[in-house]
């Protein structure tokens, strides 16, 4: 009898394929006889990369929806995602049983001439489509010009070398996985540019009733990463239910406690509200929810901005 092949749904981008291969290799380490097959899929997010307008951002979940359909329709057994792309609510048929060990969560400053954000001359152009990054950069350097930057990582670097930007901001994890760290000028500390929820984390999704696959994936489960994401995700789940503003949340485990930092701000960087807290590991989700509530209260106190207008 022929062994079952584990079918892995993935986006077609080089980074997504790289992440899927990482999962394949990890599975083969724990299950040497396993057979795998990649199922590359073009997602709504991929087709929108070159057509979306500046005012109409790519919606959360656009990079995973078609992969989830493949799972629900039994065209794939697992799907590999960047955790930061995963929606707050999953389809009722699906579950994320495994978060792999977190890679470097930081953002990278990439430039040909300049070593860091602070060295850029007034009027320099930075490329990033992330509201989170734009907000925090504008708060530090309101004299810089920020333009949207889309495409896969190699395309973005090519645009930098073509002179369309003086610098671009990319995730360290993606550059590392693609062996492109030679382009990094500065690894930006989270205190300067707080990462997105789930940045640097690979998530594996499957059908909720597929007990055999869930068991097969279990060696890849990383407890510390999962606790951090539970805390970070509580922040974004709460705040995204109220508005679509720049949000960041990043948790670390230190001395057997969870340390969570979070922020919310206006896209122009004129207002950023920050908070942080420490809790025992069993209170990770509660910590995230409490900080999110505090952020929203402080944001309303410090601005007359109608958060409901950005739903």
From Swiss-Prot:
Pfam families: Porphobil_deam (PF01379), Porphobil_deamC (PF03900). The modification S-(dipyrrolylmethanemethyl)cysteine is found at residue 243. It comes from the Bacteria. Keywords: Porphyrin biosynthesis, Transferase. SUPFAM superfamilies: Periplasmic binding protein-like II (SSF53850), Porphobilinogen deaminase (hydroxymethylbilane synthase), C-terminal domain (SSF54782). Binds 1 dipyrromethane group covalently. Pathway: Porphyrin-containing compound metabolism; protoporphyrin-IX biosynthesis; coproporphyrinogen-III from 5-aminolevulinate: step 2/4. One of its GO terms (biological process) is protoporphyrinogen IX biosynthetic process. GO terms for molecular function: hydroxymethylbilane synthase activity. Its EC number is 2.5.1.61. Tetrapolymerization of the monopyrrole PBG into the hydroxymethylbilane pre-uroporphyrinogen in several discrete steps. Belongs to the HMBS family. This is Porphobilinogen deaminase. It comes from Blochmanniella floridana. The gene is hemC.
């Amino acid at each position: 009898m022929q062994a079952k092949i584990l079918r892995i749904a993935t986006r077609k981008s080089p980074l997504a394929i790289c992440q899927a291969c990482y999962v394949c290799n990890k599975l083969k380490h724990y299950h040497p006889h396993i057979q795998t097959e990649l199922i590359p899929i073009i997602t709504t997010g991929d087709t929108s990369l070159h057509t979306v307008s500046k005012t109409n951002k790519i919606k959360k979940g656009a990079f995973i929806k078609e992969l989830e359909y493949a799972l629900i329709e039994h065209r794939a057994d697992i799907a590999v995602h960047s955790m930061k792309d995963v929606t707050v609510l999953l389809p009722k048929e699906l579950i994320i049983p495994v978060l792999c060990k977190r890679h470097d969560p930081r953002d990278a400053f990439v430039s040909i001439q300049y070593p860091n954000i602070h060295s850029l001359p007034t009027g320099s152009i930075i490329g990033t489509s992330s509201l989170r990054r734009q907000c925090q950069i504008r708060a530090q350097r309101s004299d810089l010009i920020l333009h949207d930057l889309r495409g896969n990582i190699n395309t973005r670097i090519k645009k930098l070398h073509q002179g369309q930007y003086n610098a671009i901001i990319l995730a360290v994890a993606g550059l590392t996985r693609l062996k492109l760290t030679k382009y990094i000028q500065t690894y930006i500390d989270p205190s300067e540019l707080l990462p997105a929820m789930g940045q640097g984390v690979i998530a594996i999704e499957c059908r909720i009733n597929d007990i055999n696959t869930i068991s097969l994936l279990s060696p890849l489960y990383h407890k510390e990463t999962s606790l951090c994401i539970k805390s970070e995700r509580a922040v974004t789940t709460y705040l995204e239910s109220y508005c679509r503003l720049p949000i960041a949340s990043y948790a670390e485990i230190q001395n057997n406690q969870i340390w969570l930092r979070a922020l919310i701000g206006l896209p122009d960087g004129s207002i950023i509200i920050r908070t942080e807290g420490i809790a025992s590991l069993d209170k990770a989700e509660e910590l995230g929810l409490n900080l999110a509530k505090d952020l929203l209260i402080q944001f309303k106190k410090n601005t007359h901005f109608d958060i409901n207008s950005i739903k």
